[in-house]
């Protein structure tokens, strides 16, 4: 199981690889940009499953991929 910091890193790397800004992803996922920022930086104690699934959907990622791959292997 990955930590929130590791999950946040995966999300940030994928977002950057797609050339998307935090505000764009957050808006499409229906969450505040500040919430996504805190998640990507590992500065949140919790990030609900609905939020996570919404963000992953925007980025074209699936939960099983994120949970079984390390943050360094997004290619």
Functional labels for PLM-detected ranges:
Residues 1-17:
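A short, Lys/Arg-rich alpha-helix, primarily the initiator
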Residues 12, 23, 53:
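Short glycine-/small-residue-rich flexible loop motifs, especially phosphate/cofactor-binding loops
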Residues 16, 27, 57:
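Short polybasic/polar patches that bind polyanions
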Residues 20-37:
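Short alpha-helical DNA-recognition segment
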Residues 45, 64-75:
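Short, charged recognition helix plus adjacent turn
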Residues 49-65:
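DNA major-groove recognition helix of helix-turn-helix/homeodomain DNA-binding modules
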């Amino acid at each position: 199981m990955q930590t929130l910091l590791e999950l946040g890193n995966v999300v940030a790397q994928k977002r950057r690889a797609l050339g998307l800004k935090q505000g764009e992803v957050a808006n499409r996922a229906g969450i505040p940009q500040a919430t996504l920022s805190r998640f990507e930086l590992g500065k949140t104690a919790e990030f609900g499953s609905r939020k996570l699934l919404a963000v992953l959907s925007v980025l074209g990622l699936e939960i099983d991929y994120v949970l079984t791959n390390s943050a360094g292997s997004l290619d």
